[in-house]
């Protein structure tokens, strides 16, 4: 905890719970991030979310001009640093939340934002669909768009994917799981050849 040691280099202080999970990280600049664990969800607070908390000195030091001399010595403008602190405070208490299913898998992601004009809370939900073997089947964004969709063979190998941006793509693999042929809906096709020792020789 010596000031000279903490201020030299990057020395985050990390805290863990009894199960070995990272629950809090304190950074040398006074910012703080933490994670809350629950049976059905996980709440993630980044440095902006905790900026107004008593343990986070980053905002307090800049808005009250307590470290102006240090900032100037580091080539920074204290007034601009205060402006940055005030802007960061608008994002305070807006953690991200992951909701779990009965198998402990994340299936719903909630991004908590604030309207900069009205300061009203806004929540954006991303849904994740998994099959019984925990293979990712689809991702649906806050507007209801199917961003990604996947299909698998009986062994769990991915053989098809559909992207909202890149379109559809298929994959044919051999018995060892190595790709033999890939193609997409734009008629781009790739073939892969191997020698008798299953080393790639041509594509």
In which residue ranges do the predicted regions lie?
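Acidic, low-complexity segments
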Residues: 1-203
């Amino acid at each position: 905890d010596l000031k000279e040691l903490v201020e030299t280099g990057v020395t985050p202080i990390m805290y863990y719970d009894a199960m070995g999970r990272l629950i809090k990280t304190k950074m040398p600049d006074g910012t703080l991030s933490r994670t809350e664990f629950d049976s059905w969800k996980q709440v993630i607070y980044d440095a902006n979310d905790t900026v107004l908390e008593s343990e986070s000195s980053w905002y307090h030091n800049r808005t009250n001009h307590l470290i102006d001399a240090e900032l100037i010595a580091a080539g920074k403008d204290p007034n601009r640093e205060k402006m940055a602190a005030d802007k960061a405070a608008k994002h305070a208490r807006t953690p991200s939340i992951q909701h779990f299913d009965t198998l402990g898998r994340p299936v719903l992601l909630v991004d908590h934002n604030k309207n900069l004009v009205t300061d009203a809370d806004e929540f954006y939900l991303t849904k994740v669909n998994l099959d019984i073997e925990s293979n990712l089947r689809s991702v649906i964004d806050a507007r209801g768009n199917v961003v990604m969709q996947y299909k698998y063979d009986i062994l769990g190998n991915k053989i098809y994917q559909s992207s909202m941006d890149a379109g559809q793509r298929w994959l044919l693999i051999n018995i060892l799981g190595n790709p033999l042929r890939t193609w997409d809906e734009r008629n781009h096709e790739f073939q892969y050849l191997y020698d008798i020792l299953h080393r790639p020789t041509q594509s």
